[in-house]
């Protein structure tokens, strides 16, 4: 029997559940040299902010066991350049590829302006509201660690967006569930999780942090158990769709996160060590499903009641 990998989410009709995570795939121009991006279920583009950002000082990447730390600082060319150059480039070459726009900012007004503008792009099918970036001085975690602030921002962005808004939740909180409940009540169409965990590395020679920003976001295989736990927790209190991410490098990793409650999967750090990570996972999914006598994702979900 042929496997059916299709997944239907608000604003997104996916041929398969696999997509590159924001910040790990740029705007697709580099990876598009290596394979046809039409193979992907969707594509979460690099964060868009109101003004161009150069990002943090270097060094801003450090290796860790089974992962990496990054403190890029949301470097991007700004919303107007993205609207004028990046999104048209994708639309011309991949007209049927659903694009999810990651949106960030310093203030509520910044987020609202970018959401309103980028949701007008014909190939943007959904927004990923980035309220959980740990590597910027303002915005990000200021919104993502408070249920009230997260709800206020979500409501404002949903009000102006022409496409569904998925809220990217932070793992750097004591309890993720009140924040998930708050943004659901504020109108979120779904969640994406997890963002990176705050970490640090020290150079024993200098006794100083390796990253110029001192701290960075930990990603890669090391965070997979945390991602599984938090996806499972959010699924326990909500029926909204979840785009799960954190430590996914194989089809088995993807299914484990889907068993925890994710409906689709974003692949991040794995793209750096294996540029073909996403198509490799997509190709392996039918055989991985067949191990459990399954041929689609309709019955592949965590067995728990939503409270």
Curated annotation (Swiss-Prot):
<dbReference type="Pfam" id="PF01180">
    <property type="entry name" value="DHO_dh"/>
</dbReference>
<comment type="similarity">
    <text>Belongs to the dihydroorotate dehydrogenase family. Type 1 subfamily.</text>
</comment>
<comment type="function">
    <text>Catalyzes the conversion of dihydroorotate to orotate with NAD(+) as electron acceptor.</text>
</comment>
<keyword id="KW-0285">Flavoprotein</keyword>
<feature type="binding site">
    <location>
        <position position="130"/>
    </location>
    <ligand>
        <name>substrate</name>
    </ligand>
</feature>
<feature type="binding site">
    <location>
        <position position="130"/>
    </location>
    <ligand>
        <name>FMN</name>
    </ligand>
</feature>
<feature type="binding site">
    <location>
        <position position="102"/>
    </location>
    <ligand>
        <name>FMN</name>
    </ligand>
</feature>
<feature type="binding site">
    <location>
        <position position="194"/>
    </location>
    <ligand>
        <name>FMN</name>
    </ligand>
</feature>
<feature type="binding site">
    <location>
        <begin position="246"/>
        <end position="247"/>
    </location>
    <ligand>
        <name>FMN</name>
    </ligand>
</feature>
<dbReference type="InterPro" id="IPR033888">
    <property type="entry name" value="DHOD_1B"/>
</dbReference>
<comment type="pathway">
    <text>Pyrimidine metabolism; UMP biosynthesis via de novo pathway; orotate from (S)-dihydroorotate (NAD(+) route): step 1/1.</text>
</comment>
<keyword id="KW-0963">Cytoplasm</keyword>
<dbReference type="InterPro" id="IPR013785">
    <property type="entry name" value="Aldolase_TIM"/>
</dbReference>
<dbReference type="InterPro" id="IPR049622">
    <property type="entry name" value="Dihydroorotate_DH_I"/>
</dbReference>
<dbReference type="InterPro" id="IPR005720">
    <property type="entry name" value="Dihydroorotate_DH_cat"/>
</dbReference>
<dbReference type="InterPro" id="IPR050074">
    <property type="entry name" value="DHO_dehydrogenase"/>
</dbReference>
<dbReference type="GO" id="GO:0006207">
    <property type="term" value="P:'de novo' pyrimidine nucleobase biosynthetic process"/>
</dbReference>
<feature type="binding site">
    <location>
        <position position="220"/>
    </location>
    <ligand>
        <name>FMN</name>
    </ligand>
</feature>
<feature type="active site" description="Nucleophile">
    <location>
        <position position="133"/>
    </location>
</feature>
<feature type="binding site">
    <location>
        <begin position="268"/>
        <end position="269"/>
    </location>
    <ligand>
        <name>FMN</name>
    </ligand>
</feature>
<dbReference type="InterPro" id="IPR001295">
    <property type="entry name" value="Dihydroorotate_DH_CS"/>
</dbReference>
<keyword id="KW-0520">NAD</keyword>
<dbReference type="GO" id="GO:0005737">
    <property type="term" value="C:cytoplasm"/>
</dbReference>
<feature type="binding site">
    <location>
        <begin position="70"/>
        <end position="74"/>
    </location>
    <ligand>
        <name>substrate</name>
    </ligand>
</feature>
<dbReference type="GO" id="GO:0004589">
    <property type="term" value="F:dihydroorotate dehydrogenase (NAD+) activity"/>
</dbReference>
<feature type="binding site">
    <location>
        <position position="46"/>
    </location>
    <ligand>
        <name>substrate</name>
    </ligand>
</feature>
<feature type="binding site">
    <location>
        <position position="22"/>
    </location>
    <ligand>
        <name>FMN</name>
    </ligand>
</feature>
<dbReference type="GO" id="GO:0044205">
    <property type="term" value="P:'de novo' UMP biosynthetic process"/>
</dbReference>
<feature type="binding site">
    <location>
        <begin position="195"/>
        <end position="196"/>
    </location>
    <ligand>
        <name>substrate</name>
    </ligand>
</feature>
<keyword id="KW-0288">FMN</keyword>
<feature type="binding site">
    <location>
        <position position="168"/>
    </location>
    <ligand>
        <name>FMN</name>
    </ligand>
</feature>
<comment type="subunit">
    <text>Heterotetramer of 2 PyrK and 2 PyrD type B subunits.</text>
</comment>
<keyword id="KW-0560">Oxidoreductase</keyword>
<protein>
    <recommendedName>
        <fullName>Dihydroorotate dehydrogenase B (NAD(+)), catalytic subunit</fullName>
        <ecNumber>1.3.1.14</ecNumber>
    </recommendedName>
</protein>
<keyword id="KW-0665">Pyrimidine biosynthesis</keyword>
<dbReference type="InterPro" id="IPR024920">
    <property type="entry name" value="Dihydroorotate_DH_1"/>
</dbReference>
<feature type="binding site">
    <location>
        <begin position="46"/>
        <end position="47"/>
    </location>
    <ligand>
        <name>FMN</name>
    </ligand>
</feature>
<dbReference type="InterPro" id="IPR012135">
    <property type="entry name" value="Dihydroorotate_DH_1_2"/>
</dbReference>
